[in-house]
Amino acid sequence: HFTHHLGYTPSRELLVMAIDGDSLTAATAYQFPDGVELLDLPTAYDRYGSETVDQLWLEANNQAFSWHPEQGGWDLDRLNQARDTDWYRPDDVLTLWENSKLLGFHWVKRHGDLRAGAKGEVYVVGLGDAGRGRGLGGPLVNAGINRLVAEGASLVFLYVEADNEPALRAYQDVGFVVVEHHVLYTQS
């Protein structure tokens, strides 16, 4: 490979996956076990308080992404920086609860007016330690897809690390297919 000859080796591989058509429609269905409740961020703030919810959100995020170069190790400043965009909508952050314990979250992103053909994105979805291994990942992904489709999305995409086998399997099970493959090279 010419990159190896030039002294570069792949250091990160990122896949773009997408879902549309009948697969997208099918992916809007979800169900959580009894006692597990999905709340959008404003509703969670009303119920538990914004400071508490933000702290629990950060804990779940950092548990889910302890290994991730961009998404892990967040603090409140980093979360606020991420929310300080023109596309951020608090009601596009879905939080998953069992009593007052935050199990996970799904933050969706709109790339413009969904009803005018803009794409929706699975921006960040993660389960904290208390939510893992319980079969909640698929329904949590689908809950976000449901939100985007209800608002008019006809295509939803996401980025995923190529070596994140559990996430890849989960997204493929939902109906996502790989549409792009990005490779970051570093000089060796």
Language-model region placement:
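A conserved beta-strand-loop-helix scaffold within acyl/acetyltransferase catalytic domains
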Residues: 68-125
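Residue-level recognition of the GNAT/N-acetyltransferase active site
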Residues: 128, 161
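Conserved active-site loop/cleft motifs that coordinate metal ions or position small ligands
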Residues: 105-107, 156-159
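Conserved acetyl-CoA-binding loop-helix of GNAT-fold acetyltransferases
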Residues: 4-5, 124-127, 133-150, 155, ...
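Short amphipathic alpha-helix that is part of the acyltransferase structural core
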Residues: 30-73
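Ligand-binding pocket scaffold of soluble enzyme catalytic domains
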Residues: 40, 55, 105-106, 167
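Conserved active-site alpha-helix within GNAT-family acetyltransferase domains
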Residues: 1-13, 134, 138, 162-181, ...
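Acyl-donor-binding surface of acyltransferase catalytic domains
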Residues: 1-45, 185-187
